[in-house]
């Protein structure tokens, strides 16, 4: 993955501070026991300036994740929303930006129980283009169905964007990359397709777009956006379980996510998907998605928070 490109400022516990001064104690509770929640948000350059895509939904999901994980966030929705806008304004960004809000447990107690641990909040933002590279967006990627199964919702908080959940993702992703693939695709505990290591999964069969329900995965904001776009374009969309063999015979396949955006999949387990290139429906969805996040589609302008709107805060 791409190296982080340092920016000017980071927001930490209510204050904007220089990037190089954003440090935490080595005995911070979350570093040892894994209880932290975070978000991934994108901001794009538009004709109205830098615009954040679906900031309201991402901020709400951050607070919902914290609630599920028994973390009492010391800031309100409005405070966090405004802080993210102010962070972007304080940095001189010229390209696509990735925002990473994180709520974690700091230094003050040790042991499995997190009771009494101070809650800290950090907001970071840096320029970050295509998650898997521009070639992935244009030509597609190779994916491996992982031997690692998705966490059971009876074992982890599957609806929370919790740091601990991503150990499972990390192991699956590592196995895929070291096996010569670009990304992993995980099955759920019943053997149906769940999601990628950090993306939602879609297939197209006979003109119908199919994506799994969020039974064992995060309720994805990007997945929701792409479904809305697809329906508006006149496509039939089904939310139903997908088997491994259905993937192999799909006409098209693609990942969606804040980082991944809309990334075509051309190969799964060494099997060519469709004609081995990005096909018509994926291409149409990708084109419309990028037009949406870049402020070129008035229909979805409601999802953008641009520099023009900051005076309203």
Regions found by a protein language model. Name each.
Residues 89-97, 235:
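Short secondary-structure junctions
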Residues 1-75, 79-86, 110-307, 311:
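Helix-start/capping segments and mature chain N-termini
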């Amino acid at each position: 993955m791409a190296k982080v490109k340092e920016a000017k400022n980071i927001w930490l516990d209510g204050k904007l501070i220089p990037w190089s001064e954003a440090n935490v104690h080595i005995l911070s509770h979350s570093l040892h026991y894994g209880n932290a929640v975070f978000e991934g948000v994108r901001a794009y350059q538009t004709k109205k300036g830098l615009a954040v895509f679906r900031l309201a939904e991402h901020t709400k999901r951050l607070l919902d994740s914290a609630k599920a994980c028994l973390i009492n966030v010391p800031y309100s929705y409005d405070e966090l929303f405004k802080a993210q806008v102010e962070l972007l304004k304080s940095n001189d960004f010229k390209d696509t930006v990735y925002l990473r809000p994180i709520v974690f447990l700091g230094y003050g107690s040790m042991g499995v129980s997190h009771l009494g641990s101070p809650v800290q909040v950090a907001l970071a933002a840096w320029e970050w283009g295509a998650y898997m590279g521009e070639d992935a967006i244009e030509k597609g990627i190779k994916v491996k169905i992982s031997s690692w199964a998705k966490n059971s919702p009876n074992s982890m908080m599957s609806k929370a964007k919790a740091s601990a959940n991503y150990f499972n993702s990390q192991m699956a992703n590592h196995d895929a990359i070291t096996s010569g693939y670009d990304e992993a695709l995980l099955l759920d505990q019943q053997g149906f397709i769940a999601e990628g290591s950090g993306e939602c999964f879609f297939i197209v069969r006979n003109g119908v777009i199919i994506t799994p329900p969020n039974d064992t995965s995060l309720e994805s904001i990007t997945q929701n956006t792409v479904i809305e776009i697809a329906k508006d374009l006149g496509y039939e969309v089904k939310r139903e379980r997908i088997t491994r063999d259905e993937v192999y015979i799909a006409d098209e396949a693609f990942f969606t996510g804040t980082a991944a955006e809309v990334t075509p999949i051309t190969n799964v387990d060494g099997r060519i998907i469709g004609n081995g290139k990005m096909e018509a429906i994926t291409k149409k969805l990708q084109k419309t998605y990028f037009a949406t996040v870049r402020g070129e589609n008035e229909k979805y302008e409601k999802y953008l928070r641009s520099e023009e709107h900051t005076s309203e805060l």
